[in-house]
């Protein structure tokens, strides 16, 4: 008991997370470890086709990587796999962010002595944590944050950007609705800039009030005007003092 470990490959879309997971699967298989790959039921992007990596294919019947047929289990909740993991040494889970019970069963299985290797996103296209990731991350022994390539300028990319206007947190898609971007590209959209700065200033105002025992209440319209007039480069204290009701 309590001898397992949790390893997590993360980063933006198109950052090679699943490739790292699959390579580990093959290495562990060669070492005669009993391996199980768990995939998310509703992620059917790659059914009967080749993924980002031409070595990797998924059909409704099997998962193949570098000509190795993998032991796979497809489910919507990790609880569905709880009865079968005892037959395996190492559990691999792809797209971990989609499993609502991820933090519960990753911890449970690691406590049972299983090594757990994960691949997936930490944050949404709005750079907010996926539901449950705040509970999972503190349980992990090792995290690798991989980068992708910004499609706009070739720089290292650490953020995922959605290219349509849908605001739902979970929309499963590929390069038809997502792209990997660097910080500069992420902030090229004025709506994104204003939204993020408003959130930062609001949080800063709460901290400032707590620190100074004050009760400043921000006028959002004034804050927007202040942000734009100062071209996003300003002293936050000046902003909250000039833009309170």
Please report, for each region that a protein language model flagged, where it lies by residue:
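Conserved P-loop NTPase "ATPase switch" module shared by AAA+ and STAND
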Residues: 87-99
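Conserved P-loop
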Residues: 2-78, 125-132, 180, 187, ...
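Structural motif
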Residues: 8, 90-92, 117
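Charged, low-complexity interaction regions
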Residues: 210-218
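Charge-rich, solvent-exposed alpha-helical interaction surfaces
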Residues: 200-207, 222, 226-227, 236-239
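Short amphipathic alpha-helix with an adjacent loop that forms part of the alpha/beta core around
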Residues: 78-85
């Amino acid at each position: 008991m309590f001898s397992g470990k949790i390893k997590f490959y993360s980063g933006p879309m198109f950052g090679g997370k699943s490739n790292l997971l699959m390579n580990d699967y093959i290495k562990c298989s060669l070492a005669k470890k009993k391996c199980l790959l768990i995939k998310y039921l509703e992620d059917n992007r790659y059914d009967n086709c080749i993924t980002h990596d031409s070595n990797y294919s998924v059909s409704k019947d099997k998962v193949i990587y570098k000509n190795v047929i993998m032991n796979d289990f497809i489910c919507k909740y990790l609880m569905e796999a709880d009865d079968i993991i005892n037959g395996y040494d190492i559990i691999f889970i792809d797209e971990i962010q989609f499993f609502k019970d991820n933090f519960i069963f990753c911890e449970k299985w690691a406590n049972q002595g299983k090594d757990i290797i994960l691949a997936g996103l930490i944050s949404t296209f709005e750079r907010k944590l996926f539901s449950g990731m705040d509970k999972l991350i503190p349980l992990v022994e090792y995290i690798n944050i991989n980068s992708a390539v910004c499609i706009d300028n070739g720089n290292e990319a650490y953020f995922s950007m959605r290219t349509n206007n849908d605001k739902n947190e979970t929309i499963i898609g590929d390069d038809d609705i997502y792209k990997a971007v660097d910080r500069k590209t992420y902030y090229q959209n004025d709506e994104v800039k204003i939204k993020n700065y408003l959130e930062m200033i609001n949080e800063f105002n709460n901290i400032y009030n707590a620190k100074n025992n004050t009760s400043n209440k921000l006028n959002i319209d004034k804050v927007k005007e202040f942000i734009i007039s100062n071209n996003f480069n300003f002293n936050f204290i000046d902003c909250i003092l000039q833009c309170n009701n």
